[in-house]
Amino acid sequence: HQIRDIRELENKRNTIIKDLYVVGNPYLDELSKMKETIIKENNNKKTILIAPSWGMNCLFRRFGEKLLDNIVNSDYNIIIRPHPQSLISDKDIIDKFQNRYKYKNNVEWDFNRVNIYSLSKADIMISDFSGVIFDYAFLFEKPVIIPSFTFDKRGTDAIEIDEEVWTFETIPKISFKLDENNFSNISQIIEDSINNETLKNNILKAKEEAYMYEGQASKRAAQFLNDMLITINN
């Protein structure tokens, strides 16, 4: 799905046309291997993973406690996993929420470098536009809840693309859109999203489009580079 956008940017920027070869996703392949080694915990309560991106568009800054209080005060286990860059760029707001929820026994903060452990515990994820959405959807085939907002594309390649980029076109299809006026109903929305067959089918379709050659990426990449070297040397 990235090839279309790359070709458009090359044309608009008058840059060299690149050789593009789809190898798969070595990052997801490695996470998938790790996933198989994790022992699933038995828990009577559902676990909600809050995993936003960072910066001015992230849900911490856009919605803050108006959203988080409703989630934290629900009858769920909550894992809050900030984006690693948030510890630098959004440290003020991370400190604020750590202090705000420090006495909440159902809240766990995850600053682990690897995300797979929190992903494996979650029954559903609440995010914004973070790439972890696709890690979760493709590896666990579970839905995501995303508060409704318009992403500011300034400073990104997406602003130069005529059509909607695949990421922003796909996220609404594999997630439940949460209106700001409906934050107080988050518990019911979580239950409805977890059991939503349409979302699950859309996740499977998106996975077919974006996560090709599952488990084969490293081998395919090595073979491609080897073939390129042979071509160059000849």
Summary of predicted features, one role per range:
Residues 1-4, 75, 121-122, 172:
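Short, well-ordered alpha-helix to beta-strand connector turns
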Residues 14-17, 131-210:
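Catalytic binding pocket for nucleotide-activated donors in carbohydrate/polymer assembly enzymes
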Residues 1-3, 82-87, 149-153:
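Short beta-alpha junction loops
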Residues 214-234:
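C-terminal alpha-helical cap of glycosyltransferases
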Residues 9-12, 91-101, 162-164:
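Short, aromatic/basic amphipathic alpha-helical patches
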Residues 1-29:
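Active-site-proximal region of nucleotide-activated glycan assembly enzymes
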Residues 92-134:
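Donor nucleotide-activated moiety binding/catalytic core segment of transferases
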